[in-house]
């Protein structure tokens, strides 16, 4: 029997936290395999980069590299597919071994017929000792690449709408739509109240796509607006009086 573990988007991981904790209990202790950087963005015709894979354990590991294209749904769920034909990728290697307590570097060169473009380079890691349940384990670690034009998303291309509270009344939902052809990234988000802000993580804003985000709301203090921080500007979406006085679940 084998156990295959992949990373996933943050909200999906939160929903599956109990299952993930169960799965991670099968991993050998003292192992904290790392891929870095996790994300790389390039504003050049040819993206030239490298990936470092770290094996801090005491046994050698085998690694198989698999590039994939992907798309992201409104709720942040990722769907993978074979690498698009419009992306040309050269890798220094497709498989290798990492000795114990050492690192291995992969070098790559990528270009795309149309920009913006994005893809992921997955490192599928094996060689772990079988755990007490007799399972073989493979761990998938992603390195995501964005090849972008110099022009990023325009402020007028982004539309924010409030969708109200979630069913469990612990979050407020918003849709963020990019109506333009350029890629952008929300570096962070904030739900603003009279006495302060509730921060939340950022997310990519893909061309001609909508993303639904959920931000935790705490206490009964009225909320006044949603704020997105992008590289060159910020967006503010005021809340209506009815939305602002919504009481979150304790």
Locate predicted features:
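Surface-exposed binding patches on compact interaction domains or structured appendages
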Residues: 57-103, 194-196
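Short Pro-Gly-centered flexible turn/kink motifs
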Residues: 96-110, 208-216
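Short, solvent-exposed loop/turn segments enriched in Ser/Thr/Gly
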Residues: 43-50, 104-105, 115-120, 139, ...
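Bacterial N-terminal signal peptides
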Residues: 18-26
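Short, acidic/polar linear motifs in exposed loop/turn regions
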Residues: 57-59, 177-182
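N-terminal secretory signal peptides that target proteins for export/translocation
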Residues: 1-13
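Terminal connector regions
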Residues: 112-152, 222-250
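Beta-sheet-dominated interaction scaffolds and their linkers
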Residues: 32-58, 95, 154-169, 202
